[in-house]
Every structure is written in structure tokens, then in C-alpha cells.
């Protein structure tokens, strides 16, 4: 039975434990054991596969730790305080007739800013979620002042990230659409490169994401939400004037960090752009004396602590994904669901999308899901007479499903890292569940419509 498939059981255990407020690292570890044992790998085999996968997350964790240190050094420069104080001053100096308008402008300015940055992080400035710890934590005090529901910000960030790479074939979008999606479909025997425009094929799924984002921003989380104004490593009650020399030095370091990542990405360098960019930024901050040598250890340690939890979750998620792949239960899951089609294109599209959702929820990466499902989905689509464009829409959507809404995905971990700086933003309840509802459900519907009409 489908329910007794190791992958399905493992993902269900992970989700149930996470919703029950069991720590996500413990949830991933227990889910790994369940998946391995149900697949017949035994405790030893499961642990070996889990341990082998841990190394895959080490580089990411180190990159995020260094990025956290860089973010803290930027905060030390006074740049975030300058921005936050300017917004707060505008709010407090506004008279009663203008205060509501100023607050509304500030709220939508913040939301628009993080959304645009999310879009640019996938192409123009290809740094993925690296912008979040630099941009979001310094604005937490302003968000509290505005009584902004942080679920709004989480949804805005993730929309900018996920919709962009699944729709726009530039930067990370080129990797997702051409280097992975099209490449694997071609290898499975269907010609799509130069035949199918990815922006046309993925237009309906992308539009469904936009609908989900609009509902989140305009309906679900538009009401004010109270947060305590807590002291954090990014907040300061210091009334001393900001040193503008340090501010401009921080701006230069930020530009250098972004440019170095963009150049390495453009060159297809094997060096990790995120790691190199963080190192470049840190070196510039030290070299320009934004962070004095005698304070560097405390500043950098504080930043690394900020990102350490996210790094540990990413390492654990890699181990979990390794167990799922080693279980040998992913292909049987796809094959078992294929037998349920009975020649129905509508039913086939739904089942293929749901299976993609389950796999991505478990692995935590849409980029890793595509190679797994393409080899089996392409022959099925050919047999059921789906057009090449519909095939691209089905497989592309099946891969992207679950990225926004998986506890182990960087599309959810990134926003949590920035928004939980003061401990008032829960990963499952304030990021994962809202994004699952507002993005995965519309994306499932949009993917099915695309499969039927293209």
C-alpha cells in the first residue's frame, strides 16, 4: 500500500512531530530512523546513510555562519540603525492626520523591499537567501513598531525567491529550468530545449503563486499583531550619532560581497559564491576598521550564533535526504502511484504533482527532486499524450511543490533566520504552515490547470 511506503511514512512522521512542536532537528532525525527502518535498512544502515549525508550540509552551514558574522559587522557599522531610526522618526514625527498614511507607507515599503530583494537574489544579484540576515534583522524593531505580522514578511520573501527561479530562466532560474529540468527531460527522451518556452509553460503555476501571495498579504495577515520590543544584537539604545564613515564602508563591503558572488556565479566557478562573498565582506569590514580588532571576536561570534541553528538544521536535512535516497523507496512510490491513473489525464496530473510535493517536502530541495521524478514522469506523460509544454509544467511544478512549506527547505529556513532574531517567530507555525497553505495549495491547483490546458 502507498501509505506504507518508507518515504511517505517518514515525511508524515516529520510533519506530525514538527507541528507538535518537537524541535525540527529531532523531527528530522526521528523521521530518518523511521524511513530507514521501514525500508529495511536497519539501524546501522540508516545511521551510515544519515552520517554520509551530513557532509553535504557542512559547506552550507559554514557559509551561513560566516554570513551571520558579516551581518553582525554590518549592524556594528550603524547602517541598519540609521535606516531603522529614520523610519521610526518618520512614524513618530507624523501628526495624527498623517500617521496612518506614514505607517502604511512604511509597512508596504518594507514588504515591497524584501519581495524585490527576493526576486533579485535569484538573478540580478544571485545570492539566494544570503540577503535575509543582512536586511531583515535590523528592521525587526521597525516591524514591531508598525505591529506588522511577520508571517507577511516570510510569505513575501519566499514568493520572491521561489516564483522567480521557477519562472524566470536567468541566474538560479536558468539552473532550475534549463540545466536541471530541461536536461533531465531530454535525457528521458523528450525534446523540449528550443521547442518549449519555459516562461510560457510555467506561467500558470507562477500566477497561482502570485494569487497565494496576494491572499497572504491582503487577507490572511493584514491585521496588526503585537510583539514585545526586545533587545537584540541588532538593536541599540545608544543615542550617539552614527559614524557615516563606517556606514559608507559597510555599503562598500556589501557591494563587494554581492559583486564577488555575482562574478563567481557568472563564471560557473566551483568555489562557493556564498562562502567567498561572506569572506570578502568580512575582510573589508576588518580592513576598513568598521569593526575594531579588539571587538572583532565578540562581534563575529554573535553573528555566527545567530545563524548556527539554521546551519544545524541544514546539515541534519542533508542527512535525512541521504536516507530517503538510500532507502530505494522513491522510485517504487512513483511507480505505485502511476498504477492509479487508469488512463485519466486529470487524475494522473494530480497524482504526479502530489508525489512531487511529498518528495520535495522530504528532501527539502526542489532542485534535487527534478532528477528523481523526471526519468519516470516523462514516459508517463508521453503515454498519456501530454504535450511537451504540459510535461514541462507538470514536472517543473512537481519539483517546486513543497519548497515553500518544507521544514527543511532553505526557502523557509532563511526567512525564519531573519525574523526570529528576538525569539518571537516560530519556524513551523509562523513560516512553514503559512507558506504551505498560501503557496503549495495554489501551486497544486495551478500546476493541474496548466497540465490540462497546455
What are these regions (language model features)?
Residues 43-144, 294-382:
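Membrane-embedded alpha-helical segments and adjacent helix-loop junctions characteristic
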Residues 140-241, 412-454:
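Membrane-core helix-loop-helix motifs of multi-pass transport proteins
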Residues 13-21, 117-126, 160-168, 260-264, ...:
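Transmembrane alpha-helix interface/packing and boundary motifs in multi-pass membrane proteins
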Residues 69, 115-119, 138, 157-166, ...:
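Transmembrane helix-bundle signature of multi-pass membrane transporters/permeases
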Residues 1-66, 201-319, 438-442, 446-454:
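Hydrophobic transmembrane alpha-helices of multi-pass small-molecule transporters
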Residues 98-121, 146-163, 188-198, 345-359, ...:
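Alpha-helical transmembrane segments of multi-pass membrane proteins
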Residues 28-34, 153-160, 372-377, 395:
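Central hydrophobic cores of alpha-helical transmembrane segments
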Residues 1-7, 58, 129-131, 206-207, ...:
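Structural signature of hydrophobic alpha-helical transmembrane segments
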